[in-house]
Regions:
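Bacterial peptidoglycan biogenesis and beta-lactam-recognition machinery
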Residues: 94-99, 173-175, 213-214
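Hydrophobic membrane-insertion alpha-helices, especially the h-region
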Residues: 2-16
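N-terminal capping segments
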Residues: 19-135
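Aromatic side chains
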Residues: 67, 135, 161, 207-208
Length: 224
């Protein structure tokens, strides 16, 4: 009996993980929700910005970088290393934007107190959740924090949890229409049905949508 219980205890997490990975998911169309399409295609690849941001986040999720928040003197960590904020700049890179440069520029023209930092550091400022929340609060569209207003949550949106964690909204939804989140807190599945659960622990402090049409003066495009 003891051996059986041990085997059960060991196998349950694996079974749960497999279930989470392969359980059915839904899309906006299943709930009569029209998916918002950006009018901008910054990198001119034939895919609108919101879809590009989503796909960039998903590529990072599929790459499954090891969770490691150490400081990198070059600013950008290697592709196989990352934290939650790295999902965001990588998603923006896939859409053609240099999020690091935009954050750096805004810190330089703003009061440092706005960003709650003692001094600018280009190598890390764009990798801090608090700084990204300040930046998006200033320049992105601020949207509902009500997760049950499901039509207002769209693929490529940015969600911030209590100023401590950040992710990208997926195009996948659970049976109640609540969208999945693409994020990195070191968990096995990087695209998961976690919005409602996480919001109960860390209340949502920001929900944003990027619209470069309104931001010509601050946009910096990615250059290889």
């Amino acid at each position: 009996i003891i051996i059986a219980l041990v085997i059960l205890a060991v196998s349950l997490p694996f079974v749960f993980l497999v279930y989470q990975k392969y359980k059915p998911y839904y899309t906006a169309g299943d709930f009569g929700i029209t998916t918002v399409v950006s009018e901008v295609d910054a990198n001119q690849n034939g895919i609108d910005d919101y879809q590009d941001i989503l796909l960039g986040a998903r590529m990072d999720a599929d790459n499954h970088p090891t969770y490691d928040g150490r400081y990198w003197s070059a600013g950008y960590p290697p592709d196989d290393i990352g934290v939650c904020t790295d999902v965001i700049w990588r998603a923006f890179k896939n859409a053609g934007y240099n999020l690091r440069a935009m954050v750096d520029n805004d810190i330089l023209i703003s009061n440092e107190e706005d960003y709650h930092i003692d001094y600018p550091d280009s190598n890390i400022d764009f990798r801090r959740v608090g700084n990204l929340q300040v930046f998006f609060s200033k320049y992105a569209q601020s949207l509902t924090l009500d997760i049950y207003d499901i039509s207002e949550w769209q693929p490529g949106d940015i969600v911030v949890f209590n100023g401590k964690h950040i992710g990208i909204i997926s195009d996948r939804r659970n049976r109640d229409g609540i969208p999945y989140v693409i994020h990195n807190s070191g968990q096995p599945l990087r695209e998961e049905d976690v919005l409602e659960k996480r919001a109960k622990i860390d209340p949502i402090s920001g929900h944003f949508r990027w619209n470069a049409l309104e931001l010509e003066d601050i946009v910096v495009y990615w250059e290889e």
